[in-house]
């Protein structure tokens, strides 16, 4: 058997990982502007944390979770999404306590796991970014969080992004709509896919979310959930729409959008873009006011979203958006002979301690090969170090672009490399 990575996983190699780091840094810096702090939760959770919150009838739980019994016979699952673990942590660590400032804003970046057919931008191990805001039922919280996603896509330069918006209303509104949907779909049950027939009485809203062609056809004339909103749900949704208008964030009201997780209520949304005539959801989320109490905490309003990093990077690549990846080093030390080995090590360490990026030759290669490496690394400066330089404790440094050279003592290099760069016009 060849030792290879498991199906649906990837190795993010040097060079490619620099793109990830750039995007993650943009995300972290933006979230700081909105006063979000990072939370890190375990990669695996008790099975019930996910199954009870995400929903027993969802595809995630019925088809996609990696779950197993550990050596203590505990039922464990690799986390398939980030919200349920964060809510579990919020309750377990009593972050709802009065001394914790509200709203409590947290974000995460980490691996998630789902057993599904691998395709571009969708792997079995994937990386998700998410934000969760606890303690505010103000519609402005919904809009600020949506605006943060919009802000991120602007910062990254992503084009043709459309915001799809809907409301699932209160639990009472949702229950009334659930019954209306059952009444509408039951007479045409046989026209639905097998999965949707099974779900019809368990959770008919899942039929709206189905990607099967027969289901899409069946729900074309289905009743709209917006017709079943109670007065307070309608007022909340109207306020969200009004605030988005005020911020000049365009949106499409999409009444067939229900999201793939069962814990949402009131506002739900997706940011969608087109790649090669295919619609891709790049960010999705909504309000989940009942989830904290479901985990044993007090009634707590909450709002959040998640987005996949693989999909985000795929879109950046497909749209030809250049990422400003720094791929230069400040100094390359060409080492001539074993006599210069220790001096090269000592100088490199001294310059690194001053905050500069340094590489050197370790392989005893010919000088031409070493200069070629310096060009490959985009070195700003080249130092050529041999036995005569070690004896004199002076060495020449060359600007790799202009070819200007200066001769500098080891002592000056070890204490003031920045002034050496200035002498070379850098």
Swiss-Prot record:
Residues that span the membrane, as ranges: none
Keyword Cell inner membrane: no
Pfam family, one: HGTP_anticodon
Lineage, opening ranks: Bacteria, Bacillati, Bacillota, Bacilli, Lactobacillales
Coiled coil: none
InterPro entries in alphabetical order: aa-tRNA-synth_II (IPR006195), aa-tRNA-synth_II/BPL/LPL (IPR045864), Anticodon-bd (IPR004154), Anticodon-bd_dom_sf (IPR036621), His-tRNA-ligase (IPR015807), HisRS-like_core (IPR041715), HisRS/HisZ (IPR004516), HisRS_anticodon (IPR033656)
Protein name: Histidine--tRNA ligase
HAMAP family referenced in this protein's UniProt entry, alphabetically: His_tRNA_synth
Domain of life: Bacteria
Gene: hisS
GO MF term (any one): ATP binding
GO CC entries: cytoplasm
Listed NCBIfam families: hisS (TIGR00442)
Keywords: Aminoacyl-tRNA synthetase, ATP-binding, Cytoplasm, Ligase, Nucleotide-binding, Protein biosynthesis
Family membership: Belongs to the class-II aminoacyl-tRNA synthetase family.
Subcellular location: Cytoplasm
Record bears the keyword Protein biosynthesis: yes
Gene Ontology biological-process annotations: histidyl-tRNA aminoacylation
Enzyme Commission number, as recorded: 6.1.1.21
């Amino acid at each position: 058997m060849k030792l290879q990575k498991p199906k649906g996983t990837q190795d993010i190699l040097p060079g490619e990982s620099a793109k990830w780091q750039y995007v993650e840094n943009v995300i972290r810096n933006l979230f700081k502007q909105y006063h979000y702090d990072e939370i890190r939760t375990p990669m695996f959770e008790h099975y019930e944390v996910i199954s009870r919150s995400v929903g027993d009838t969802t595809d995630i739980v019925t088809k996609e979770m990696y779950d197993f019994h550990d050596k203590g016979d505990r039922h464990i699952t690799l986390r398939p999404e980030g919200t349920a673990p964060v809510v579990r942590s919020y309750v377990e660590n009593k972050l709802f306590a009065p001394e914790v400032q509200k709203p409590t804003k947290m974000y995460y970046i980490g691996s998630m796991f789902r057993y599904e057919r691998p395709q571009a931008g969708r792997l079995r191990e994937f990386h998700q970014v998410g934000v969760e805001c606890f303690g505010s039922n103000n519609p402005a919280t919904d809009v600020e969080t949506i605006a943060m996603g919009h802000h991120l896509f602007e910062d990254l330069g992503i084009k043709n992004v459309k915001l799809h918006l809907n409301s699932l209303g209160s639990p009472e509104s949702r229950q009334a709509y659930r019954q209306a949907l059952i009444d509408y779909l039951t007479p045409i049950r046989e026209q639905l896919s097998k999965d949707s027939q099974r779900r019809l009485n368990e959770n008919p809203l899942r039929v709206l979310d189905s990607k099967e062609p027969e289901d899409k056809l069946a729900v074309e004339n289905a009743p709209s959930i917006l017709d079943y909103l109670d007065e307070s749900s309608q007022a909340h949704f109207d306020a969200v729409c009004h605030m988005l208008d005020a911020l000049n964030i365009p949106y499409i009201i999409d009444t067939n959008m229900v999201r793939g997780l069962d814990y949402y209520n009131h506002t739900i949304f997706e940011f969608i873009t087109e790649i090669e005539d295919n619609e891709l959801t790049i960010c999705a989320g909504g309000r989940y006011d009942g989830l904290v109490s479901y985990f044993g905490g007090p009634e707590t309003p909450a709002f959040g979203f998640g987005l996949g990093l693989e999909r985000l990077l795929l879109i950046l690549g497909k749209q030809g958006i250049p990422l400003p990846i720094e791929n230069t080093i400040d100094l390359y030390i060409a080492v001539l002979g074993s006599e210069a080995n220790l001096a090269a090590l000592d100088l490199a360490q001294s310059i690194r301690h001053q905050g500069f990026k340094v590489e050197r030759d370790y392989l005893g290669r010919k000088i031409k090969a070493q200069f070629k490496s310096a060009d490959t690394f985009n070195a700003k400066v080249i130092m050529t170090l041999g036995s005569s330089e070690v004896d004199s404790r002076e060495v020449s440094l060359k600007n790799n672009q202009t070819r200007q050279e200066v001769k500098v003592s080891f002592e000056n290099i070890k204490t003031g490399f920045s002034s050496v760069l200035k002498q070379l016009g850098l």
